[in-house]
């Protein structure tokens, strides 16, 4: 750790404090994540170390690069490449004008490329949200914290006792499904796509049941026809209110037909029918995709 000079605290992630730091030997600016684990007494689980070490192999232009893993007396530091801003801050800064559609399209395309790459290596994210999508001044967007959920679990609260958001969580997880797939990340990205377009969260639930009911009120309460097996999921209740599905033109009014078609496939209830990242990249919505540069206020 003595090789790094902390420059400033840049945030508080799910697992610990994140610092902007400088490598004293190379001058490289990095993001330093200090991982706080409940197992402070026993040290860092070897399974977590193994999982994290595998992530160093995930090299892709749309994945935040894990440069190093530093394990010293019961603490774990992850050294990542540094990016200027996260998508949440960028959306907040663009709240009045909105993000231009060509930039939304570029961001979604890049994120799907990153997901397709990770999913092809059987790595899930499980906790995608605007706060862990990072952008730079050149128009790139990258997925951060990939694979950390598998190494450390997804806590209910962060180490500072903040509630971990449910807004982007797939319905199969909310319904208690223990075995889920890459489709959970596509759901999260669909919610983020809608949020970039409308400038507000699609399903801003404040509890698991509120989260489910917000989804049901928009997409209709799922049944065996749209989602075979749903009624036998651990947390499914026959007493759930029966809501009808809303028209997507009312849900995301600014989007054209291609955009609505892609979004509805990303938000398919049945994870087996939900579009894959690879298939989404070939969707007509992206036939005119470009790579514009954002106006970042840093």
Swiss-Prot record:
Phenotype upon changing residue 45 to L: In a glioblastoma multiforme sample; somatic mutation
Alphabetical keyword list: Acetylation, ATP-binding, Cell cycle, Cell division, Cytoplasm, Cytoskeleton, DNA damage, DNA repair, Endosome, Kinase, Magnesium, Meiosis, Metal-binding, Mitosis, Nucleotide-binding, Nucleus, Phosphoprotein, S-nitrosylation, Serine/threonine-protein kinase, Transferase
UniProt binding sites for Mg(2+): 132, 145
Locations listed in the record: Cytoplasm, Cytoskeleton, Microtubule organizing center, Centrosome; Nucleus, Cajal body; Cytoplasm; Endosome
GO MF term set: ATP binding; cyclin binding; cyclin-dependent protein kinase activity; cyclin-dependent protein serine/threonine kinase activity; magnesium ion binding; protein domain specific binding; protein serine kinase activity; protein serine/threonine kinase activity
Active site (UniProt): 127 (proton acceptor)
Enzyme Commission number: 2.7.11.22
Site feature location: CDK7 binding: 9, 88-89, 166
Regulation: Phosphorylation at Thr-14 or Tyr-15 inactivates the enzyme, while phosphorylation at Thr-160 activates it.
Residues with PTM Phosphotyrosine: 15, 19
GO biological process: cell division; cellular response to nitric oxide; cellular senescence; centriole replication; centrosome duplication; chromatin remodeling; DNA repair; DNA replication
PANTHER family per UniProt: CELL DIVISION PROTEIN KINASE (PTHR24056), CYCLIN-DEPENDENT KINASE 2 (PTHR24056:SF521)
Family under the similarity heading: Belongs to the protein kinase superfamily. CMGC Ser/Thr protein kinase family. CDC2/CDKX subfamily.
Subunit note: Found in a complex with CABLES1, CCNA1 and CCNE1. Interacts with CABLES1. Interacts with UHRF2. Part of a complex consisting of UHRF2, CDK2 and CCNE1. Interacts with the Speedy/Ringo proteins SPDYA and SPDYC. Interaction with SPDYA promotes kinase activation via a conformation change that alleviates obstruction of the substrate-binding cleft by the T-loop. Found in a complex with both SPDYA and CDKN1B/KIP1. Binds to RB1 and CDK7.
Name of the protein described by the UniProt record: Cyclin-dependent kinase 2
Gene that produces this protein: CDK2
């Amino acid at each position: 750790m003595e090789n790094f000079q902390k420059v400033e605290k840049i945030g508080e992630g799910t697992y610990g404090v994140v610092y902007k730091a400088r490598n004293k030997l190379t001058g490289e600016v990095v993001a330093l994540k200090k991982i706080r684990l409940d197992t402070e007494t026993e040290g860092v689980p070897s399974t977590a170390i193994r999982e994290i070490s595998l992530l160093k192999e995930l090299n892709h232009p749309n994945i935040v690069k894990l440069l190093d893993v530093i394990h010293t007396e019961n603490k774990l530091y992850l050294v990542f490449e540094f990016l200027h801003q996260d998508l949440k801050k960028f959306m907040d800064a663009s709240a009045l004008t909105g993000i231009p559609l060509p930039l939304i399209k570029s961001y979604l395309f890049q994120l799907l490329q990153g997901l397709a790459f990770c999913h092809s290596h059987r790595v899930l994210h499980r906790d995608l949200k605007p706060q862990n999508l990072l952008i730079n001044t050149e128009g790139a967007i990258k997925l951060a914290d990939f694979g950390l959920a598998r190494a450390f679990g997804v806590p209910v609260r962060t180490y500072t006792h903040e509630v971990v958001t449910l807004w982007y969580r797939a319905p199969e997880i909310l319904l208690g499904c223990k075995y889920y797939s890459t489709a959970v990340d596509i759901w999260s990205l669909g919610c983020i796509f809608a949020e970039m377009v409308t400038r507000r969260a699609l399903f801003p639930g404040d509890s698991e049941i509120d989260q489910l009911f917000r989804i049901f009120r928009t997409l209709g309460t799922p049944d065996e026809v749209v989602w075979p097996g749903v009624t036998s999921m651990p947390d499914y209740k026959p007493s759930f209110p029966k809501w009808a599905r809303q028209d997507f033109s009312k849900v995301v009014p600014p989007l054209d037909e291609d955009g609505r078609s892609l979004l509805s496939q990303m938000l398919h209830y049945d994870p087996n029918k939900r579009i894959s990242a690879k298939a989404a990249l070939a969707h007509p919505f992206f036939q005119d995709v470009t790579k514009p540069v954002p106006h970042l206020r840093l």
